[in-house]
């Protein structure tokens, strides 16, 4: 609570396996360097490395109020685990080269995070009174439930990227937009199901495929 947390040479948060972090009215900054061993670069990661030093289970990140500053890479990355991410009224500063808001996929990490083609993520993401920008990337070996509540907004696209999904699977991306929440579609999007009581808007003719 009311913490100042700054990582000058790494991601801001790394949660592995059955562990959790809850922040209230805190300021979080990450500055991870690009690394050829990784498939991508991130600010917050929820994952399972299979090194044996962390019990397998649901990883949880919850943040209520405060700020996140991302100085390099995408924002949230989850792979080879089950996880819960909940954001409420967090002020987010993105870097100019941010590749995603959330990536929920398998991986081909050179450190060996699970079996390639079977190491996706099962992610429950909830935005509460939360403004968000950037793409949400998912694949067919992952399960993503993405909830927008209480006036949350997203400016971005839902992108199905099978680069790290091997032969694929039966995964999904379910999107729920509650009343007073808004998704502004900035790129052609693919999702599995949509429940919309809010608003979906697009000024550039982008498509949403379900």
Name these PLM-found stretches.
Residues 1, 5, 207-210:
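Short, intrinsically disordered, charge-balanced linker/junction segments flanking boundaries
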Residues 2-9, 24-43, 59-72, 88-102, ...:
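Beta-strand-rich solenoid/repeat architectures in extracellular/passenger domains
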Residues 5-17, 30-33, 70-77, 81, ...:
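Glycine-centered low-complexity coil/loop motifs and glycine-rich tracts
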Residues 9-12, 44-53, 72-75, 111-113, ...:
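Short, recurring structural edge motifs at helix starts
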Residues 17-18, 23, 56-58, 63, ...:
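Parallel beta-helix/beta-solenoid
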Residues 30-55, 95-116, 159-168:
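Acidic/polar low-complexity surface segments
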Residues 50, 54-55, 80-81, 198:
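Long, ordered, amphipathic alpha-helical scaffolds
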Residues 116-119, 123, 129-210:
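Extracellular beta-solenoid/beta-roll
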